[in-house]
């Protein structure tokens, strides 16, 4: 909706936005990198062009210009969008539960009431996708603390992208640290595994990391967040007839990283371009080779033939950050991709590729 309303021909359209949640809490944080200022530049609460990477065998400062790593708080996003959308009389909001989506007579059922439309843009993923034998389905799950200290302890000019200096017993696990100021930072514990942990395990690992690697024992937890994102080779449907799937439901979560926000913006821009030209708004996803790259890495992680921390350590040890970030944004060229792939251990990736192909 926000992308549509940037264009006068689409501002005349009537839109109904349906969500079960009132969106009044700071329940999540989005991070991404891009070169240019995007639509949500005004609400990026912090940006960095200096990142840090840590593992047991590598500590490296990453200067990522012309990229900037950006952070958006959920509550800022909700307020910004609500304020902008409420200025348009054709936009209506409805808080309720979507009980059914109809692709024949295009519309939705919300709390027992039917609504019809020219198009339905659906962001609700299927509850029980049917996986093939080759499909990999891992979970990226994370718990984050916004911590505050009385003294200045953080360098707000640099963020930690990945820090693998922690137990890998459950699978690929790392923390990232996003300092908003010298005494306030988001510390997030992230795992790529088939199953979730017990709630207290996330807190225990976060407390250990903060104590051992941030050297902090005196701090306050101002906010906390928890989330789960699928990391999968499963091909989500683009939709049916005039129902267009968007977000994770439309395959906009990158399988190998879990990053979603940036890809949603790219997808939304393509949808708007189709609408402006009078065409059907179902658009192609990224080139198929990127899905293949994701599937190979996920297969490596599933087989545990090469631990995730070794994969990412090798990527950042042997490559400059800019091509790696372009690669992870599905924005790299074939020669760049070939160079990056050549730096990774051949055998585990070859086996995984063969398993995915055959």
Provide a role label for each language-model segment.
Residues 195-225, 241-244, 265-289:
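Flavin-binding catalytic cores
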Residues 34-96, 101-103:
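A conserved beta-strand/loop capping segment in the N-terminal third of enzymes
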Residues 249-270:
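A conserved FAD-binding loop/helix module that cradles the flavin
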Residues 3, 7, 84-220, 232-235, ...:
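Predominantly flavin-linked oxidoreductase catalytic cores and closely associated redox partners
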Residues 1-3, 331:
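Catalytic phosphate/metal-binding cores of nucleic-acid and nucleotide-processing enzymes, i.e., regions
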Residues 269-358:
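C-terminal helical "tail/cap" subdomain of flavin- and related membrane-associated enzymes
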Residues 42, 169-172, 226-245, 255, ...:
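FAD-binding beta-loop-beta segment adjacent to the flavin cofactor pocket
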Residues 3-59, 75, 143, 147:
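N-terminal FAD cofactor-binding segment of flavoenzymes
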């Amino acid at each position: 909706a926000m992308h549509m309303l940037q264009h006068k021909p689409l501002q005349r359209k009537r839109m109904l936005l349906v969500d079960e949640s009132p969106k009044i809490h700071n329940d999540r944080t989005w991070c991404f990198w891009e070169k240019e200022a995007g639509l949500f530049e005004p609400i990026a609460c912090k940006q960095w062009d200096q990142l840090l990477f840590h593992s047991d065998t590598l500590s490296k400062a990453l200067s990522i210009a012309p990229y900037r790593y950006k952070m958006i708080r959920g509550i800022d996003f909700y307020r910004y969008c609500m304020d902008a959308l409420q200025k348009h009389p054709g936009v209506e909001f409805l808080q309720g539960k979507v009980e059914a989506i109809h692709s024949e007579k295009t519309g939705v059922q919300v709390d027992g009431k039917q609504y019809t439309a020219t198009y339905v843009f659906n962001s609700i993923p299927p509850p029980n996708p049917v996986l093939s034998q080759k499909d990999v389905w891992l979970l990226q799950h994370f718990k984050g603390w916004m911590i505050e200290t009385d003294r200045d302890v953080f360098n707000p000019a640099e963020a930690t992208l990945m820090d693998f200096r922690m137990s890998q017993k459950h699978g690929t696990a790392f923390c990232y640290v996003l300092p908003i100021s010298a005494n306030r930072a988001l510390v997030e514990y992230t795992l790529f595994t088939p199953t979730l942990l017990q709630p207290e395990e996330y807190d225990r690992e976060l407390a250990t990391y903060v104590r051992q690697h941030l050297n902090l024992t005196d701090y306050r937890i101002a906010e906390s967040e928890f989330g789960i994102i699928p990391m999968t080779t499963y091909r989500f449907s683009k939709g049916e007839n005039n129902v267009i799937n968007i977000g994770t439901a439309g395959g906009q979560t990158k399988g190998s990283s879990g990053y979603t926000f940036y890809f949603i913006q790219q997808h939304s821009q393509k949808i708007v371009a189709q609408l402006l030209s009078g065409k059907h708004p179902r658009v192609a996803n990224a080139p198929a080779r990127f899905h293949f790259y994701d599937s190979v890495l996920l297969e490596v992680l599933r087989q545990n033939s090469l631990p995730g921390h070794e994969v990412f350590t090798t990527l950042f040890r042997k490559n400059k950050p800019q091509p790696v970030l372009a690669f992870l944004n599905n924005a790299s060229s074939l020669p760049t991709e070939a160079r990056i792939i050549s730096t990774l251990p051949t055998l585990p990736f070859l086996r995984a590729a063969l398993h995915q192909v055959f």
